[in-house]
Structures are given as C-alpha cells and as structure tokens.
Amino acid sequence: MTTRQPLYKSLYVQVLVAITIGILLGHYYPETGVALKPLGDGFVKLIKMVIAPIIFCTVVSGIAGMQSMKSVGKTGGYALLYFEIVSTIALIIGLVVVNVVKPGAGMHIDVSTLNASSVAAYAAAGAQQTTVGFLLNVIPNTVVGAFANGDILQVLMFSVLFGFALHRLGSYGKPVLDMIDRFAHVMFNIINMIMKLAPIGAFGAMAFTIGQYGVGSLVQLGYLMACFYITCLLFVLVVLGGICRAHGFSVIKLIRYIREELLIVLGTSSSESALPRMLAKMERLGAKKSVVGLVIPTGYSFNLDGTSIYLTMAAVFIAQATDTTMDITHQITLLLVLLVASKGAAGVTGSGFIVLAATLSAVGHLPVAGLALILGIDRFMSEARALTNLVGNAVATVVVAKWVKEMDNDKLASELDSGGAPLIDTRPTDDLGVAEGPAR
C-alpha cells in the first residue's frame, strides 16, 4: 500500500504557488521582478541541455527495438497526416474568429507612427525563413553541431538514421542498444533533479513578465488577448476534445494527466521545457516508445496548434488595426503561406513572433512595422500558445499510436482514470528503478 505524498511535496502545488508569488512580486515590486529573469532563463537552459540526448536515446531505442522498419515509415506518415490536418483546422479557426470578432477594428493606427526599430530583429530573422532553407536546415552540417545547437529536427534526423543502422546490425548492435538504454536512465535521472528547480524557474519567469510589462499595460490590447485565450480554450475542448472522443478517451482526463507539465509550461511560456517529461509520460500512458520518440519531437515543429491560431489572428489583427485591406484573396494567400511558414516554428518562446514576421514579409501588403502593436503583449499570449501546443502534441501521440495499433488501451484507460502518479518520486535515488525513465 502506497501512502499519498503530502500536498506541499507535489510539483503541481509547488509550481502553482511559485507562479502566484511571482505574479504578486512582479506587480508590487516590478524592479525586483525584472531582476529575477535569470531564474527562469537558467531553468529553461537546464532543460534544453538534456533535450538532445534524451531525444536521441528515445528515438534510437524505439526504432532499433522494432520488429519491422515498415512500421516506422507508417508511424511517420500517419503523424505528418495528422499534423497537417489539425494544424490547418487551427489556422482556419483563428482566421474565422478574428474576422467575426474584429479585435483590431476601430484602432486606426498610422503605420508611420509605429516604432519599427523594436521589431527589426524579428523581421530580420523572419526574412531568412524560407521553405527550402527550412528543409535544408533539417540536415545538420555535423552531428556534433546538431547536438551542440540543440536543433530538435536535426537531432531527430540523425537519431532516426542511427536507429535504422543499429536495427540492421541485429544482434551485433545489441551491446550498443543496451548502453543507450542505460544512458537514457541516467538522463532521466538528471531530468528528475532539474525538475526539483521547476518552482524556482517558474517563479523567476513569471515575476519578470509581470514586472517588465505590468498588468495595466494589457488593457488596451486586452480584447485581442481575451479572444485568443478563449479561442485556444475552445479549440482544446471542442476540436481536440472531439478527436479524443472519436478515439475513445477524454481530453479532460488527458489534461489532468499532464497537469504538472502544463504548469511548467505556464511558468516558462515554452512547451519545449516539458519535452523530456512528455516523452516519459506518454510512454507510461501506454504508447510504444517508437511512436512517442517520433511523434513528440516532430510535433514540436509540425504540430503547434496554439501557434497556428496565434499566427492567423495576429496577422489579421494588424491589418484591422492599421486599416489595411484584407479581402478573401489576401486571406487565402495568408492561409497558404502560413500552412508552410507555421511548420518552421519551434516550441520555444519567441519563435511564433519570428514566424509572424516572416509571414507579414511574405504576404507583402501587410505592414511589418505593425508587429510593434503586439510586441508588448506577445509574451502574455505565449502562455496560451505553449499550453495549447502541449495538449495538441499529447493528443497527437495517443491518436497516432492508436492508428498504428501501438497503444495499450487498457493502460491508457487505467492511467487516465487514476490521474497519473507524479513522475518525480520522492524516494531516495538509490531506491528508484526503471520507473524514473520511460516505461519499459
């Protein structure tokens, strides 16, 4: 019989309390809040430090351990099909909502009065985003460079090739596979140690956000923010909820299952900060390692539902606020551009803004200087983006695993009904076994 851990030891409660304290500190002592930014940055950097090796271990172990290579291609194909369909729905929903609600109408902003210098860095980065450049960037110049830069897609590509090669070696490659499995357990132990700092990271990041931008500064653009948050909520409950119901599970129970990861993302505004834990959690939920290893990392570039909603809403909002004409032809062009450009966003803070800059440049008639309008609130909107992205990737993993019949449905039902035990165990490290890493 296991005893329930005290409430104060729950990561969920710790992060929630830390976020609350961070908001209060940032509001009443803004200068102190701004000075705490390194706490949030440091936590995210610690997470990023182990993402590449964890993806490598998970993908290689999953692919090398499969019976047939055909199933890898099948999983990847189904995943990309799902990503394209759902992200397109997200783009269309964002476009419909912003046209119906018209949050930017009546602002009559003169583009010449905007401070374009504040968005110059984003516009420059966005100008470099091309389809060919994105595809070529998936191929790393060197293996070491891919791991050093922490580029998820580059690491994923090398990991898939490594897994295929190891699979072809058969029993000869077994010692290497065993070593990678052991290395994975070490990496997940490191993640467990880092996660003990999650409340500190969330506290620092939230204190900085409120201290830097202030709650009062949100009033003018609060309408757009409210529309965006409500749209994301409806997307999760209606669209993703409908997908979940069609596949025999509840999105509400899934959200409860990943509640700790959602709070970490809420504090850091980066869905990437929860990636290592998501790999372990989705495998423990019943999805095979090979599916989790392909769907989750790939989804961080190809299945960003929250970012897709944000991109269409923000682009049309800028057009409305600056009285720029957006007829049906312009909006279809915008949608087509975003179908490609949105795949270049990563699950890190600020990437959505860079893709938005690229989109405004590509569409042509939309003023890039209009980005200055939403620069101040982008940081606040990033929370909803990141949370929606995380839930979207969790749903995608379960759905794709069910499609390729690599999901333990009994385990899925059991874990969701129980709400999922905390991933971080409070027992001494010596007593922890395989449970700390991905489920075997």
From Swiss-Prot:
One of its GO terms (cellular component) is plasma membrane. It is a multi-pass membrane protein. It is found in: Cell inner membrane. It holds the Pfam family SDF. Its main location: membrane. GO terms for biological process: L-aspartate transmembrane transport. InterPro entries: C4_dicarb_transport, Na-dicarboxylate_symporter, Na-dicarboxylate_symporter_CS, Na:dicarbo_symporter_sf. Residues 419-440 are annotated as: Disordered. Keywords: Cell inner membrane, Cell membrane, Membrane, Symport, Transmembrane, Transmembrane helix, Transport. The keyword Cytoplasm does not apply. It comes from the Bacteria. GO terms for molecular function: fumarate transmembrane transporter activity; malate:proton symporter activity; succinate transmembrane transporter activity. Gene3D superfamilies: Sodium:dicarboxylate symporter (1.10.3860.10). The chain crosses the membrane at residues 7-29, 49-66, 79-101, 143-165, 186-208, 221-243, 291-313, 328-350, 355-377. Responsible for the transport of dicarboxylates such as succinate, fumarate, and malate from the periplasm across the membrane. PANTHER family: AEROBIC C4-DICARBOXYLATE TRANSPORT PROTEIN, PROTON/GLUTAMATE-ASPARTATE SYMPORTER. NCBIfam families: PRK01663.1, PRK13027.1. Belongs to the dicarboxylate/amino acid:cation symporter (DAACS) (TC 2.A.23) family. This is C4-dicarboxylate transport protein.
